[in-house]
């Protein structure tokens, strides 16, 4: 029996070995491409999860959830320093951050920025303590008398309390 007759006997539809290997190569290539895309999707998902805190510059008091207050995770709290809320005891500074809807009491150990004052924009970095107070380890104040963080200005505009430009 010749080689061609032997191939036809094993493959009754008349497809030769060459067609089978091309099909196998295509299938293998598809699996490789699919696998690479899956690995890429997982990598992008992990990167987005890792940078989740940095994607959003800060949260306003109204944006906070119960999980934010109990998880112990670090984040940035932004808003306005409420009028009449600033008090200092030794190196401890206490103040309230508001977005005119909700307020959050903040405790900061250290020297506040020179531009820190009541009624001005502020971003505090830290986490909630077991006592329910936001424990800031860094406080950022506005840069000049016209500066309010864009996210805060947008939030205040939506709520109808924005008086700036």
From Swiss-Prot:
Q: Where in the cell is it found?
A: Cell inner membrane
Keyword Flavoprotein included in the entry's annotation: no
Gene3D superfamilies, alphabetically? Answer: Nucleic acid-binding proteins
Q: Which UniProt keywords apply?
A: Cell inner membrane, Cell membrane, Cytochrome c-type biogenesis, Heme, Iron, Membrane, Metal-binding, Signal-anchor, Transmembrane, Transmembrane helix
Q: Name one cellular component (GO) term.
A: plasma membrane
- The superkingdom listed in its UniProt entry is Bacteria
Tell me the Gene Ontology biological-process terms attached to this UniProt entry: cytochrome complex assembly
Which loops or segments lie on the Cytoplasmic side of the membrane, by the record? 1-29
What coarse category fits the chief subcellular location reported for this protein?
Answer: membrane
What is the role of this chain?
A: Heme chaperone required for the biogenesis of c-type cytochromes. Transiently binds heme delivered by CcmC and transfers the heme to apo-cytochromes in a process facilitated by CcmF and CcmH.
What family is this?
Belongs to the CcmE/CycJ family.
Checking HAMAP family in the record gives: CcmE
Protein name stated in the entry? Cytochrome c-type biogenesis protein CcmE
């Amino acid at each position: 029996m010749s080689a061609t007759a032997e191939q036809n006997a094993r493959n009754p539809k008349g497809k030769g070995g060459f067609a089978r290997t091309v099909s196998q190569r295509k299938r293998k290539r598809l699996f490789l491409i699919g696998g690479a895309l899956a690995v890429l999707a997982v990598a992008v998902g992990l990167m987005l999860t890792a940078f989740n805190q940095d994607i959003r510059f800060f949260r306003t008091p109204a944006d906070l959830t119960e999980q934010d207050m109990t998880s112990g995770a670090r984040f940035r709290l932004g808003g306005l320093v409420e009028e009449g809320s600033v008090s200092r005891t030794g190196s401890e500074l206490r103040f309230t951050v508001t977005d005119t809807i909700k307020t959050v009491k903040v405790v900061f150990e250290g020297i506040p920025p020179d531009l820190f004052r009541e009624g001005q924009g502020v971003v505090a970095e830290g986490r909630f303590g077991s006592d329910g107070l936001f424990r800031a380890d860094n406080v950022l104040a506005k840069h000049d008398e016209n500066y309010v963080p864009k996210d805060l200005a947008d939030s205040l505009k939506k709520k109808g309390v924005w008086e700036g430009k």
